[in-house]
Amino acid sequence: MNPSFDFTGQVALVTGAGAGMGLATARAFAESGAAVALTDIDEAALNAASKELTDAGHQVLALSCDVSDEDQVAAAVDHTVETFGRLDMAYNNAGIQIPPSDAADEPAERFERVNAINLRGVWACMKHELRHMRAQGSGAIVNCSSLGGLVGLPGRASYHASKHGVIGLTTSAALEYAPRGIRVNAVCPGTIDTPMVSDMIAKGELDRADAEANQPINRLGTAEEIAQAVLWLCSPGAGFVVGVALPVDGGYVAR
């Protein structure tokens, strides 16, 4: 049991739960007593994550889901509620990163793909989660934006558009649903030491030493640090926290 949080008897859904921040958050929810629905488009990673948590004695449901397909999202959320009887918390984490590209040369297909996953995917997840939470009259949703939702960096216009958009979705839904007992917030991770970031480093799209030097804390963040922020936003301790975009970035945006 995670001594920091107690979600016994509650149900959480985590998208992109096969690795990185999603897996760390699913693990943290499970260790805090919640039943957890895991979704991911990567079935091998999803099955490995499910096995890890099941072998540890946690209550888990694994669902293959492409968040860019609203029908799949609706089915996953509905299946979660049918299985566990309710939905109390959701972390809409699934997303992709893209290599740098000159804004004048970027193909429309690339813009559409990153926004289909990072923005429309979050919209679809939040939409269908809210349907069930609205019926309950309670719930907490955390959408994964990014440091890139708070600032702009050259070469990543499509990515920044998607992550700025997530904050817009979050604030609008937060204001709409706070009077109904549902809190919606966003977490904005900085550069986090995950498989996705490791892949970017391996491809030469990111220099680890530069990334560490750009953080006032002089290191990359960990997936577990993002998980703790997400769990706090879902906890009673954050009961008066509504519509925030919480940077977890080692001080980057405070510079």
Give the predicted meaning of each segment.
Residues 2-4, 97-100, 151, 231, ...:
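Short C-terminal tail/terminal secondary-structure segment
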Residues 104-123, 138, 142, 159, ...:
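Catalytic Tyr-X3-Lys loop
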Residues 126, 162, 170:
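Active-site helix of classical SDR
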Residues 178, 183, 241-243:
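Short, small/polar-rich loop/turn modules that mediate ligand/substrate recognition or access, typified
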